């Protein structure tokens, strides 16, 4: 009885938390605009014109009357309280009923689980998964659709059919039908359930009559609710037109539903188009529907004979079978089938059904995210190479899940064989024990770590950039300066190396004053060599005018490429020995270096800074590199490359502490040393490498802290606590993504405190005080102090710079990021990052001979990103199925808190934003291998992964470094249509 009360309390806590989370998500997201505008407009029209005037001629309203009453109620509340359309409260009101229905579905899963496994914690685990299912969360709270309200009566219908309560089930089916026409997709399952009752019951005549009663009850809700809208005379024609018109309004193979037809390339393809051997998509869809329906009849007949007839199981099979194989499927049509699968998992205590529900929740979540995030963009119809790849890959994954469901259903129906869910999570059953001690560092391991770090440094610093560049500019900022120069030989080209400009101009004129060349100098031209044709004879005099800009150097070249000696020119021609032999990334800025690298120079020279959209710490580090090596390509890239090298031993140490297996740590170090993103991102003078480094350092300190707390208590863990706060502060001061990491650190910080309390050690009150005060000191005060201190270069430039100015900087940063609407040809959404589908094309060398190409791309390292994704999914599955570990949970938390905020970002984003998250992909991969039962096989697999990473790194090195290669070889590197570099 006591356990039952605890389970009930826990259930209410889960449901309450799930509802609150949905309301928060509803508040911070705007919803799918087309559905939102329809729902609001329909409610207002119903309120204004009444039911009889709602379906007026020419007015678009493709929903039946069932849910319109709820929308009318929402409109009434908005009218009473004068709530505008754009108000957050409007979003909350629209999401409230579907969210409550989602929570009711979770409670139903719990109830079914309690009937199957009374007294077990498994029903609570299943209910928690449904309550926080990302597919349902996104559908109800973010998209703000009504599928939760539509699915609930369907779920209750098939639950009652399990109990053989046929007539109430039929009434509930009618309620679902009154809300959405998609209920008709489950009509064959309802019919099978009623017809099998004729076979199962002794009184077959009664069962036969019940079929008619059930049909009448199923039609009652649509008819009763439709009567005020259509009137008695037009009731049946009006309803039939509404249901038939909705079904025929989207004549495409699939309408953003990532299923088998999408995997075949059928998204938004007209139904009459041929797909194979003259067969149209429509014919293929109907054929598949016939197959799925015949399968339903066979499974029903087989299960009746075996005494294992289960409406929930059949409804799950049929709902997902239709979504996977039929035509005209929208992205959200899978929602009822997914929840039915989870109900069936509870009914049959089968982990395979749970796994399918888990897998399809993820594929459906990505499906909805893809459609939602691209709404209103140029890629709204998912026609780009990236979006098409996502649709195909997710469609394949969804199809695989359905095949697994089919095997599971067959095994249960035909053989009565189930694979029970684990009894309970073993670690949760007892207080957490003190972790095993860390293995001692051996000499050979230290030498291996040093050797790997040295090798990484050699590869990273090689071909990084020139250590020579012009340093003395002609500075015409705020004025206009003219220099006269005489060429001592024939000229063919003019090379220009501008500095900082706030909207300036370079003009070259001949002796007669005729303009030969004119170039706008702005933010995009700084510290980058450019070449233009400039043909003239020896002895020609040029008048060169610089207006409101810096120009560090000019150079004249002859037809054979040699430097042309000049007379005069002042500062424009005073460093000819610093002119490079060829223009490339080795001597010029590229991508966002024109913002961050330039700002490092400005900070060093106490100039007004250009880049103010990120905190300054990363640019402070760039400034130090410039101070050491001058304003050269090597100088502005030095600090980032150094941090990229140091990231490798840090990852080694992090994985070693996490897994306690030196071999896994060594594998992680090698994989990161060969990772594409680490290499290219660290050699680019931007700030992401610094944020990533400190995020991983903070994670290392937090794992260290957690282990110390469990071993010796909070009072013995002050050092990692303090160092973790230091790392957190540095990460926030480098980039705001460090704040995302803080959420994960906070969860682990509080979680280990709870775990320590569960250990029941004496003196916990003193430990709690230490944790509380230490948390304030080291994770609030210290990071804030570091963040403020990172603005010291601002104060050096302007001693009057104070806290009010600092605060205005923060407001400006927030406003910039929250209102940014810029687009970029190589932007990508978070769900494409998981597979690295859209690299960022950083640089193309336009000064190469024909037949050669050179590019730099920010790419995903296939081994870490793909292998890590598989490992993360495995850890997540272990966790939600009750078989996880504290280490696995920690990695998932750190990964999730780094990635999830990007799911809510609608601004332009890039693949490199996933770089910090990829550190925990690496940790997940190492953890899965380190905890494998067969360690010999795990080590062999780890070695194979390292070998694969080396081969891939060598193959893709030109695309990561900018090394010129033959054009045919470059074209081979564009492996996917979505790559697009070179």
Predicted regions and their residues:
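Transmembrane helical bundles and short interhelical boundary loops of multi-pass, membrane-embedded
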Residues: 239-255, 298-301, 315, 319, ...
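Transmembrane-helix signature of polytopic, membrane-embedded enzymes
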Residues: 81-89, 100, 104, 109-134, ...
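Transmembrane-helix motifs of polytopic, lipid-linked glycan transferases
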Residues: 92-117, 156, 291-301, 638-659, ...
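Aromatic-rich transmembrane-lumenal/periplasmic boundary elements in polytopic membrane proteins
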Residues: 23-63, 69, 219-264, 561-600, ...
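Membrane-interface transmembrane helices that cradle and orient dolichyl/undecaprenyl
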Residues: 114-121, 155-168, 195-202, 349, ...
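Short acidic/glycine- and proline-prone juxtamembrane loop motifs at membrane-interface regions
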Residues: 141-147, 330, 636, 640, ...
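Perimembrane helix-loop-helix junctions
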Residues: 186-220, 231-232, 336, 701-712, ...
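Aromatic/glycine/proline-enriched transmembrane-helix motif characteristic
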Residues: 202, 242-324, 407-416, 840-894, ...
């Amino acid at each position: 009885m006591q356990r039952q009360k605890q389970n009930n309390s826990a259930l209410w806590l889960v449901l309450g938390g799930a509802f609150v989370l949905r309301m928060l998500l509803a508040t911070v997201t705007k919803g799918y605009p087309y559905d939102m505008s329809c729902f609001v407009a329909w409610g207002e029209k119903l309120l204004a014109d009444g039911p009889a005037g709602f379906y007026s001629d020419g007015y678009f309203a493709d929903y039946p009357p069932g849910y319109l009453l709820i929308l009318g109620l929402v409109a009434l509340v908005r009218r009473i309280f004068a709530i505008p359309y754009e108000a957050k409260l409007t979003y909350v009101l629209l999401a409230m009923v579907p969210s409550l229905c989602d929570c009711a579905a979770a409670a139903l899963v719990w109830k079914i689980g309690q009937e199957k496994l009374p007294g077990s914690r498994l029903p609570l685990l299943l209910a928690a998964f449904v309550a926080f299912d990302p597919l349902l969360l996104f559908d109800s709270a973010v998209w703000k659709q009504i599928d939760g309200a539509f699915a609930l009566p369907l779920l209750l219908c098939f639950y009652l059919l399990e109990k053989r309560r046929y007539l109430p089930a039929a009434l509930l089916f009618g309620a679902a039908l009154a809300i959405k026409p998609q209920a008709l997709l489950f009509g064959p399952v309802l019919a099978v359930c009623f017809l099998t009752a004729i076979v199962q019951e002794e009184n077959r005549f009664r069962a036969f009559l019940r079929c008619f009663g059930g049909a009448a009850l199923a039609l009652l809700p649509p008819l009763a609710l439709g009567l005020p809208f259509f009137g008695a005379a037009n009731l049946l024609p009006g309803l039939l037109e509404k249901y038939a018109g909705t079904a025929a309004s989207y004549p495409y193979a699939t309408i953003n539903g990532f299923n088998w037809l999408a995997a075949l390339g059928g998204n938004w393809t007209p139904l009459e188009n041929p797909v194979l051997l003259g067969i149209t998509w429509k014919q293929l869809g109907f054929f598949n529907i016939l197959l799925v329906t015949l399968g339903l009849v066979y499974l029903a007949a087989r299960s009746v004979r075996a005494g294992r007839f289960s409406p929930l199981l059949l409804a799950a099979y049929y709902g997902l079978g239709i979504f996977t194989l039929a035509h005209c499927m929208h992205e959200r049509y899978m929602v009822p089938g997914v929840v039915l699968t989870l109900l069936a998992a509870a009914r049959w205590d089968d982990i395979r059904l749970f796994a399918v529900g888990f897998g399809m929740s993820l594929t459906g979540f990505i499906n909805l995210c893809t459609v939602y995030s691209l709404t209103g963009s140029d890629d709204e119809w998912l026609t780009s190479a990236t979006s098409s790849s996502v649709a195909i890959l997710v469609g394949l994954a969804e199809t695989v899940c359905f095949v697994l469901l089919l095997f599971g259903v067959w095994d249960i129906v035909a053989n009565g064989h189930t694979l029970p869910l684990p009894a309970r999570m073993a670690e949760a059953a007892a207080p957490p024990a003190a972790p095993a001690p860390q293995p001692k560092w051996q000499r050979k391991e230290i030498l291996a770590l040093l050797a790997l770090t040295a090798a990484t440094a050699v590869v990273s610093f090689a071909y990084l950039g020139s250590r020579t560049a012009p340093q003395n500019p002609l500075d015409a900022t705020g004025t206009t300066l003219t220099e006269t120069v005489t060429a001592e030989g024939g000229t063919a080209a003019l090379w220009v190396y501008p500095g900082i400009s706030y909207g300036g101009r370079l003009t070259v004129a001949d002796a007669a004053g005729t303009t030969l060349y004119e170039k706008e100098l702005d933010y995009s031209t700084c510290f980058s060599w450019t070449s233009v044709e400039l043909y003239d004879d020896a002895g020609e005099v040029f008048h060169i005018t610089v207006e409101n800009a810096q120009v560090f150097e000019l150079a004249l070249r002859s037809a054979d490429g040699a430097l042309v000696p000049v007379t005069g020119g002042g500062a424009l021609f005073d460093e000819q020995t610093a002119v490079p032999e060829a223009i490339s990334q080795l001597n010029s800025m590229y991508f966002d270096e024109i913002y961050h690298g330039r700002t490092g120079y400005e900070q060093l020279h106490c100039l007004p800074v250009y880049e103010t959209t990120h905190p300054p710490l990363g640019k402070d580090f760039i400034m130090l590199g410039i101070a050491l090596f001058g304003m050269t390509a090597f100088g502005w890239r030095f600090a980032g490359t150094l941090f990229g090298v140091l990231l490798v031993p840090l990852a080694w140490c992090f994985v070693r502490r996490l897994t306690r297996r030196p071999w896994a740590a060594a594998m992680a170090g090698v994989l990161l040393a060969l990772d594409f993103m680490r290499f290219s991102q660290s050699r680019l003078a931007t700030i992401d490498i610094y944020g990533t480094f400190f995020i991983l350092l903070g994670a290392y300190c937090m794992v260290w802290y957690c282990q110390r707390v469990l071993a010796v208590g909070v009072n013995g863990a002050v050092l990692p606590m303090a160092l973790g706060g230091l790392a957190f502060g540095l990460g926030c001061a480098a980039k705001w993504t460090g704040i995302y990491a803080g959420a994960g650190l906070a969860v682990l910080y509080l979680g280990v405190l709870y775990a320590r309390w569960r250990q029941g050690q004496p003196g916990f009150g003193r430990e709690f005080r230490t944790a509380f005060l230490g948390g304030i000191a080291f994770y609030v005060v210290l990071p804030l102090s570091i963040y403020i201190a990172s603005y010291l270069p601002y104060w050096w430039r302007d001693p009057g710079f104070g806290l009010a100015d600092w605060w205005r900087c923060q407001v400006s940063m927030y406003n910039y990021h929250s209102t940014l609407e810029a687009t970029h040809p190589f932007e990508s959404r978070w769900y494409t990052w998981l597979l690295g589908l859209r690299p960022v094309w950083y640089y193309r060398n336009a000064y190469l001979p024909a037949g050669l190409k050179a590019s730099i791309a920010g790419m995903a390292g296939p081994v870490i990103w793909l292998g890590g994704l598989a490992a993360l999914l495995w850890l997540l599955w272990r966790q939600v199925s009750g078989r996880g570990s504290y280490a696995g949970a920690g990695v998932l938390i750190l990964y999730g808190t780094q990635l999830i905020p990007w799911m809510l970002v609608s601004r332009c984003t890039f693949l490199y934003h996933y770089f910090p998250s990829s550190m925990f992909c690496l940790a997940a991969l190492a953890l899965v291998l380190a905890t494998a039962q067969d360690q010999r096989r795990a080590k062999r697999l780890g070695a194979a992964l390292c070998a694969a990473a080396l081969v891939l790194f060598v193959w893709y090195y030109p695309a990561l470094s900018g090394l010129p290669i033959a054009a045919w070889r470059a074209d081979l590197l564009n492996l996917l249509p979505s790559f697009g570099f070179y």
